[in-house]
Amino acid sequence: MQCSYPLARQLERSSALNNNLFQKAAIWLVIALVLFTVFKQFDKPRAQDSVTYSQFMDDAKNGKVSRVDVQGRNLVVSPKEGSKYTIISPGDIWMVGDLMKYGVQVTGKADDEPNVLVQALYYLGPTLLIIVFWFYMMRQMQGGGKGGAFSFGKSRARLIDENQNAVTFADVAGCDESKEEVVELVDFLKDPQKFQKLGGRIPRGVLLVGPPGTGKTLLARAIAGEAKVPFFSISGSDFVEMFVGVGAARVRDMFENAKKQAPCIVFIDEIDAVGRHRGAGMGGGNDEREQTLNQMLVEMDGFEANSGVIVIAATNRADVLDKALLRPGRFDRQVYVGLPDIRGREQILKVHMRKVPIGNDVDASIIARGTPGFSGADLANLVNEAALFAARRSKRVVDMQDFEDAKDKIYMGPERKSTVMREEERKATAYHESGHAVVAKLLPKADPVHKVTIMPRGWALGVTWQLPEHDKYSKYKDNMLEEIAILFGGRAAEEVFLNAMSTGASNDFERATKIARDMVTRFGMSDSLGAMVYVDTEQDGMFGKLSSKTVSEATQQKVDAEIRRIIDDQYALAKRLLEENRDKVEAMTNALMEWETIDAEQVNDIMAGRPPRPPRGAQGPNSGGNTPPGGSPVAPTNAPATARADETV
């Protein structure tokens, strides 16, 4: 029985392929037939204007013509010298007698009977070509889906039968609270009488809200898998097309199909593509989206009962959804699926490690502590990258070193070992990263330094990587001020030790300025401006979100002055710390020049005044380098908030 589904899918795929080939062959056959008919019609011999009838009769009289074939008014003349030509007879009744008198052989042929099919193709051929081309374009716009050009109103929802869906709650880890919120749906789908006897009504719609990659789709499939009911899956963008009314028709068709399979689950991924609040835009496309949303509102809670169909939707933009969509009776329950904590990350890692041969030295709890901020998708990618590292090294199992290398690659980008840079540029990068690391170690509330490297990775020439000791859910003023000082440690080290400035600190400045601005304008952390919000407000308008200024020019000048004060104070703090600890910066720079990468143990040795021990798997100074001047100073996009990624040029 396990082979029946793959075999059925293979037969279905083969049948679809054969149908597609047959349709293409039929189209090209029609085109070829029409073209052949047209060319044949135009291929008939035409009368030549170069020889007149009078000249032809003179040639016949002078014995220059041997034969004439008469076919209607067309005369095919065969001269004694030269090639045949055709002329049109003017209707001379004495012509045949004269030709025979001149000794010309005359033959007659009946006119060709007109072929009705050929004439029909000749006159209707262009119209047929236009119709065939129109059908072809309609199928192309529909992606070759079932039904062709007349399937616009058909739902694109994909039905996953209860016997095909093998996902259960055991496959979902790291979101125990979210699973508890939806377990009632499973009980209702298994035994609806239990709730109906007491007059209870199960939520008709559940909205899963959370960042990307946290397992919203997986949780919806697990609900259907646990309840053993059919599962319809569709994306919000599949409803709206270029033709008016298609979206509403697809919504109706989807719910009609779902009611036939009830009890069942309809899962709409990225519902914000069709469920955005109405009135925030203009134009035909916006009207079509609103019609689709209106139809969805009616289907979920209108005059007609929708018993047995539970709608589960997922989005990471719940703030843009229409209020009518979120009211009780439609999506009356919102379940937040957030980033997993350290325990959740450990559970997720163990789920994904089931499919990978793991070494005895691998500890999921240690990996979980070193991956704060990772989503479930990130952790799945981490396990996959570790397996790829092990495969490249021809290992039989995936060990802890493979996970460390995979984590470094995801956090900081892939190594660019082939990049070669001059010695002075490597040293400038080493001073820059040492400045970040030393300032981070000297500030009391900063996150511990996990690794420092001048090995080029991704867009960065060097990275100072900090990891928090535990998950953080809020920040305090002291933490944010220290974060700004750490960001300025790189530029301050360049000034103190090299008496120079590079473009490598540009990303540091962007992030430091943003933190300082948020402290003043959003979080009320300014003593002079007080606990007020000074950011521009946003409101819904005809063209979407519109922002308006809420502060005067004089107040804005005070805001800018306060941001400047915070920046200057933290830059001065970073510079003072480096000047007071020159020996530590020099020692760390020398260690980076020798090994290119040092970890937390070597950093602690240097800060304690001890010679740094050689790191495990130390790399020589010639194993890589930095990019030449002129490279982009932008940090890698996958660097976490606690990583310092800089490019020194």
From Swiss-Prot:
Top enzyme class of this protein? hydrolase
Instruction: Please give the Pfam families that the UniProt record associates with this protein.
Output: AAA, AAA_lid_3, FtsH_ext, Peptidase_M41
Required co-factor(s) are:
Zn(2+)
Principal localization?
membrane
Its record classes its membrane topology as: Multi-pass membrane protein
Topology Periplasmic: residue spans: 40-115
Q: Can you name a GO cellular component term? A: plasma membrane
Q: Where in the cell is it found?
A: Cell inner membrane
Tell me which residues this entry annotates as catalytic.
433
What positions does the entry give for Zn(2+) binding?
Answer: 432, 436, 508
Cite the residue spans of the region called Disordered. Answer: 606-649
Q: Which residues form a coiled coil?
A: none
**Is Signal set as a keyword in this record?**
no
Q: Could you provide one GO biological process annotation from this protein's UniProt record? A: protein catabolic process
Q: Give the E.C. number(s).
A: 3.4.24.-
Keywords in alphabetical order? ATP-binding, Cell inner membrane, Cell membrane, Hydrolase, Membrane, Metal-binding, Metalloprotease, Nucleotide-binding, Protease, Transmembrane, Transmembrane helix, Zinc
* Ranges of compositional bias, category Low complexity: 616-626
Q: Which family does it belong to?
A: In the central section; belongs to the AAA ATPase family.
According to UniProt, the name of this protein is ATP-dependent zinc metalloprotease FtsH
Q: Gene of origin? A: ftsH
